[in-house]
Amino acid sequence: MKKLVPIEIGEEKRPKDIKAIQFRLASPEKILSWSHGEVKKPETINYRTLKPERDGLFCAKIFGPIKDYECLCGKYKKMRYKGVVCEKCGVEVTTSKVRRSRMGHIELVTPVAHIWYVNSLPSRIGTLLGVKMKDLERVLYYEAYIVKNPGEAYYDFEKKNPVKKYDVLNEEQYQQLVQHFGDTGFDARMGGEVVKELLEEFDLVEAFEQLREEMKNTNSEAKRKTIVKRLKVIESFLNSGNRPEWMMLTVVPVLPPDLRPLVALDGGKFAVSDVNDLYRRVINRNQRLKRLLELDAPEIIVRNEKRMLQEAVDALIDNGRRGNAVKGANKRPLKSLSEIIKGKQGRFRQNLLGKRVDFSGRSVIVVGPNLRMDQCGLPKLMALELFKPHLLAKLEEKGYATTLKQAKKMIEDRENVVWECLQEIVDEYPVLLNRAPTLHKLSIQAFHPVLIDGKAIQLHPLVCSAFNADFDGDQMAVHVPLTEEAIAECKILMLSSMNILLPASGRAIAVPTQDMVLGIYYLSKEKEDAKGTHKLFADINEVMTALESDYLDLNAKIRTKIDNQVIYTTAGRLIIKSILPDFVPVNLWNKVLKKKDIANLVDYVFKEGGPKITAEFLDNLKELGFKYSTVTGISISAYDIKVPDSKKRLIEEAKRKVKEIQQQFQAGLLTEQERYNKIIDIWTDTSNEVAKEMMELMKNDKDGFNSVYMMADSGARGSSAQIRQLAGMRGLMAKPDGTIIETPIISNFKEGLNVLEYFISTHGARKGLADTALKTANAGYLTRKLVDVAQNVKITMDDCGTHEGVEITDISVGNELIEPLEDRIFGRVLAQDIMDPITNEILFSEGTLLDEEKTRKIIEAGIKSVTIRTPITCKAEKGVCAKCYGLNMAEGKLVKPGEAVGIIAAQSIGEPGTQLTLRTFHVGGTASRSAEERQVVATKEGFIRYYNLKTYETEDGKIIVANRRNAAVLLVEPKIKALFNGEIEVKPIHDEVLITLSNGEEKVRYSFKKSDFARPNELAGVSGKIEGKLYLPYESGTKVEAGESIVEIIKEGWNIPNRIPYAAILKVKDGAPVTQKIVSGAKGVVKYYKLKGDYLERFEGVKEGEKIEEKGLFAVIADEEGREAARHYIARGSIIEVADDQSVDKDTVIAMPAKSDKTVIAEWDPYSIPIIAEKEGVITFEDIIPGVTAVEQVDEFTGETRLTINEYIPAEYKPAIVLAPKDGSEIIRYVLDPKTAIYVQNGQEVKLAQTLAKTPKAAAKSKDITGGLPRVSELFEARRPKDPAVVAEIDGVVSFGKPSRGKQRIIITADTGQTVEYLIDKNRQILVHNGEFVHAGERLTDGTVSGHDILRTLGEKALMYYMVSEIQQVYRRQGVNISDKHIEIIVSQMLRQVKIVDSGDTKFIPGDLVSKKEFRKENEKILRLGGQPAIAEPILIGITRAAVSSDSVISAASFQDTTKVLTEASVSAKVDHLEDLKENVIIGRLIPVGTGLYKDRKVKVETASQE
C-alpha cells in the first residue's frame, strides 16, 4: 500500500482518479479554508430584481456569478475577462458552475455542539469526558452547570465527598458551592463554551493510560463495559489525529447555493429548498446574539439566545434528532442536511447508486414469436430517437447532408434515406433490455434489434421466464451501450443466447413454456390404434411422405431404424428428432415429453453442444411447439372436466367415519385435540382419494387426449391441485388465523358451491392477494440486505491451497428427502480423495472438479458423504478462490477470477423470495396435514445392530426402548468378516484406525481413515449423517468367532429420540436380517460371492427360487470386460430370482424378500408420551389429590375411574408417581406434567415396563413453525429464537443440582472432571434425565436451537451445515432449486468477524468485534515483534449488522443507519480504499469485478474494424 497523500479538491484541479477517501472531522481552520466569504445576512434574492442579495445566502460575491462569464452588475461580460474581479460588485468573472462547489461560512458567536457527536449513540463528547448523555444535553442547552475546576469544593460539611471535575450541577447546588468555595478557585459553567474548553484541555494519552490501568484492576463486568466504550472513543481520536474540540462548531460551513436552489415557479412564487430556511434561522439567531452581547444584555436573555442558536444548528444538521422537528410553512418537518443523504430518497440511493441515463427509452412489450433467440423487435420511432447522434453522423458520412442542421431537418421530415441509414447502424449494434424489478442478472440482457413498425417492443417468448415477463401490459426499458468496450461486453457476455442457464442452479431457464410445451407434448404422445400403427419405415423422409399423404397418423406407434437399431417410436417424435443435434441419445427424446423432459433435453444439449447450438435448437423447438399447438387446436370445454362417480360414495364414507369419531369423543375416549386431528386426517385422505379417482378418470378419457388432462400433465398450464378444485372437491379451508375449518368444501367448481361454502372460500382468496403484496416488499428488502452483505465477495485467485473442507451428505428431514447428495456435490471441488467403498481404490483425488459424469459415478459407487471445499474454509485473503467456489453455474465451467460471486449469490437467494410463502404455520394449521409419524420402516437391506441400546421386555414379549438418548438402531451390511476365532484390537493412530484380529497363532490387520467411521455424536443424532459411514460392532478386547462381521457399513440409522421416541415398541431384534426387493444396478452377468475377511470369495451353485441362509452373500454384476459394474448385498431370508451366471438387464429383480410387507423397525403411539416403570416394584402417589391437582374421570366402556392431572397445578404441589423397586434399590420419581392420565392405582404392584401414565402430545406445547420467507430472514439475520433451546456445551453426564429461585439446575460433568451448569426456567420441558450421557451441541430443553449456540458448541462447519440445510428446506419445499454455494457465501460473510476474548499485546480491546482479516494481520505483526497474540472466538452476525459493519464506509453508509456510520467514520478518520462494488458505483468509477479488473492491468480492448 503506497503512502496516500491527501488532496484538496478545488474547482480547477479535479484529480483524474481517486485511490481512497478519508472521512475526518473538519477543524474551524479547515472550514475557513474551504470558504469563499462569510454569509452575514439571511436574505436570499431580491424579489424585485431577482438578483442575489450581497452577503446573503446566494451572494454572487461569495459563491460566484449567476451567468457564465458575467459579473452581477454587468460591467464585465465575455470570456476574455476570465478571472477578473469586478471592483463594483466584487464578483469574479468565471463559469457559473462554480456555484456548485464554492462554499461559504457563518462565524458563530458562541461554540455549539455538533448534534451527531452528542446524540448519536454512543455520544462521543459524553463518552470522552465521561459524562452521561442526558447530563451533557442539560449543560449544552443551558439547564445545568458542569464543573471545570473543582478548587477545594465539597458536597458535605464533613468534607468526605469532594466535587470532581466534570460533575454536573443544578442551579441550586451551583449557587451553594459558589457561595462557599467561590474563592478557592471553584469554577463551573454551562453551555457550549465550557464544553469546548474542557475538550481542549482533555489529555487523551493520559486518559488512555489511566483507563487501561483501571481495566486491569476492575472485576465488575458493568464497569469494564463502560471503560471499553471510553477506550474505543479515546483510541479513535488518538489514532486519527482528530482533536476532540473539533466536535464543537465555531464556524458553520454553508453549502454551495446550486445544491440548495431557489426555483422560480410560475406566478412569481419560489420553491425554496428546506436547507435555506434552516440556514436562515441560524444566521438570524447568530446576528441577534451578536447584538445582545454588544448591548450587554442580561445573562438570562443571552443564555436563551445561545440555547436557540444551538437548537438552530442542530436543526440544520439533523432536524428532529432532538426534541420536536422544525416545521415549515406547510406544517411538515424541514429536510435537514442529514435527511438529504439518508433513506431511499436520499443522495446515496437516489442519485449515486441509481441514476437515470441518457440513450434509453421504455415501451410496452408484445410477443415476437418469429424472432431469433438473440433478437428483439425495436419500434422504428424509438430507434430513431435512441440512435439520433449515430444517425446524424451517418447521414453526414454518407454525404446525404452537409451540415448538422440539414441532417436534423432530414430526420424531422422522416426522409427515406433516414430509415436506410438507421437500418445500417442497427445491424450488428446490440441494445440492452431491462425489466423492472431487476431481481437477478438475467433481468438485463442484450439483443440485436430488428426494426419494426408499431410502438411496442417485441420480446422473444423464451426469454420471458428470465425476465419474469408476460404480455398483459408489462413495460421494458431499452438502453444503448455507447463505448466500444460496452458493445463488446454486450455481444460476448450479455446476449440472450449466452444466458441460457440460471446462475442460481445451473439449470436451463430458456425453456419452452405454455403453448410450446403443449405442442411438443402432443407431438410426442402415442395414440392406441391410430392410422398406420406398427408399420415399418426406412427413414424420416418416408415418414414425412406418409404423413403428408394422410397414410399415417401423427401419434401412431411405428417402427423405424435409428443408429442401426430398429426402435418403436411415433411420427411426431421423429419430427422432434429432426431438429435435435445428432449427439442426443434415443432415450432422451423417444418418450412423452413433458415440461421437465424438455428442460432435461435443453440441459443435455447445452452440456454437450454449448450455447450456440443450444440457441439454435431452442428456436427450432419454439417454432415446432407453436406450430403444433396451433394445428392441434387443443381447447377446454366444461365437458372436459370430469367428476368421478365414486365421489358420492367416498364422501358418504368419510361422513360416517367422522360421526364415529364424534361419538368416541362424546364417550370421553378422545381429547378435543385428538378428535380435531382425526377429523382433519379423514377429510385430507378423502380429498386426496377423490382427486386420485378424478385424475384416473381424466387420464383414461379420450385415450389420454382429454384437453384439461393434457394441459396439466404436460406442465403447460394448471396443476392437479387446480383440476381437483374444478372436478374433485375443494377440500379443507383455513381460517384467517391459519387453523383449519373442520368441515370441508365438498362441492367443486363444476357443481358449484353453496352459499356457506362460497363464504368460507372468500377468506383464502382475499388472504392470497394481501399476502402477495406484502411478500414482494419483504423479498425485495431481503435481496437488498443480501446484496449489501455480499457485494464485496469476488473470485480473487485460482487456488488458495487449503486442504480443509466440509463433509456433506444429502439433506433430509425424517423420511422426506430435501436435497439429494448429487445436487449438493455437483460443480464442487473435492477436499479429500474419494475412495470406492467396495474396492478401496481412489475414485477421484483431492482437487477434482465434479462434473455430472463424475457426480454420477460417486452416487453409483454408493458413497453417502463427500468432503468438498467451500467458501467458508477458503483461505484467500480477500474474496474466495475459484477452487473453493467450484463451477460457475451460469456457464457450466470453473469460475474465472474477477467473477462477482457475492452479488450472484445474493440475487440467487433473493430472486425466488417472491415465490416463498409468508405465513407462519400453526401445528394443525395447514390445509394439507401429513398424518402423524407413528413408525419407522426400513428401506434398504442388511441386518440390524443396536448401538448403545437398552431395552425392557414386557410380560407379553414386547421389546421396549429404555434409552432416552445417545442410542440408535442401525441397519448395516458386512464390510469385513473375522477369518478365524480371535480377539479384536482397535487402535487409532493419527488420522487412521488400525483393526487387528489375533489368536496367538494367526494375526490380520486392516486400516481405515478415521473420518470413514461414524462418530459417537453422529450416531446419537446430534450432528451430521451416518449413512455410508463405517461402524465397529465390537469394542477393543472383544473375542469374536469366525464369520462374525467386525466392520460394517451403515445403510440406515434411526437414532433415539429424534427418529424413535423413548418407550417405542421395537419390532426387530439385534442381528436380525432385513430383506428387500433387490434390483440390478447395471447390465451384465450375475455372479454370487461370499465375504471372507475383507475380500469376496466365489460362491457357486445359487439357484433360482432358493432361500438364502448364508451370511455375507453378495451378488456382483460383471460387465462385458468382466469388471464389477454393481454389487448388491443379499440378506439372509431373501429368495433368489436370478441364478448364478445368468445375464440380466439394468433394473432386473435379482432377489425378493421372504415376506411381502415392509419391515417395520419400531412403532409408537403418536398422540401421547408414555411413562413406564423402569423396574418391578410398588407405586405410591405424591401430591396427586383428586379435586386439587387431579380430577377423576370414569371410563364409560370399562367403568374404571382414572385420575387425570389438572391443566393448572397450584404452585406448592408437584404431582409425581413414586416407584419403590422390589430389589431395594433407590426409589424412582416420575414427575407428572399437566393433563397426564394415570393408568395405575396408589399402592399397586407393577411389572417391568408397565405403562404408568400417558401425557397427551398436544400438551407438549404446540409451537408455531415459521416457514417461508420469515424463516429465511430469521436465519440470515441470525435472530435468537424467542425461547431457544438450552444446548450442552461439552460432552458429559447429566445430573441435577439443587434448584435456585424456582429454576432447575442441570450440571454436565465431562470425563475430565470439567463441569458446566445451566439454570432452566421451570416452565420449560427438560429433555434429559439424570445420569444420561449428552454430546456437545445436544438440546437439553425444548425450543429451537439457535445458530449462535451451534457455532459456540460445534464450530463453523456445523453451523454452515445447519444454515444450508435449514434454508434449503424452505426453498426446496417450494420447488426452488438453489445451489448450496450461494448460501455458503452469505454464511461466510456472516462469520467474517471475531470477538476478542483476550487482547494479549495487540491494540484490540476485549469485547471488540474485528474482521478476521484485521485480526490475522495484527496478530502476525505482534508475533513478529515477539509479543503475545490476541485470542478471539468466532461469532455469527446477522446480515443487516454485517452490512452496516462493512469495512467500506461509503458502502455501509449507503445501506442503512447513514448518520451513525458517518459519525463513527469521521471520529476515527476511517479510510475507504474503494475496493468493492458499491463504493465504486457511488464514486462513478468502473467496478472492480469481471472485465473491470483489467482496468488496473492496462489491458487495451482492441475492436476488430467491422468490414
Swiss-Prot record:
Residues the record lists as binding Zn(2+) 2: C800, C874, C881, C884
Biological process (GO), any one: DNA-templated transcription
Record carries keyword Transport: no
Annotated SUPFAM superfamilies: beta and beta-prime subunits of DNA dependent RNA-polymerase (SSF64484)
Pfam family, one: RNA_pol_Rpb1_2
Catalytic activity: RNA(n) + a ribonucleoside 5'-triphosphate = RNA(n+1) + diphosphate
Residue numbers binding Mg(2+): D470, D472, D474
UniProt binding sites for Zn(2+) 1: C71, C73, C86, C89
Gene Ontology cellular component annotations, sorted alphabetically: DNA-directed RNA polymerase complex
Complex formation: The RNAP catalytic core consists of 2 alpha, 1 beta, 1 beta' and 1 omega subunit. When a sigma factor is associated with the core the holoenzyme is formed, which can initiate transcription.
Protein family membership: Belongs to the RNA polymerase beta' chain family.
Function: DNA-dependent RNA polymerase catalyzes the transcription of DNA into RNA using the four ribonucleoside triphosphates as substrates.
The protein, known as: DNA-directed RNA polymerase subunit beta'
Species of origin: Nitratiruptor sp. (strain SB155-2)
Gene this protein is translated from: rpoC
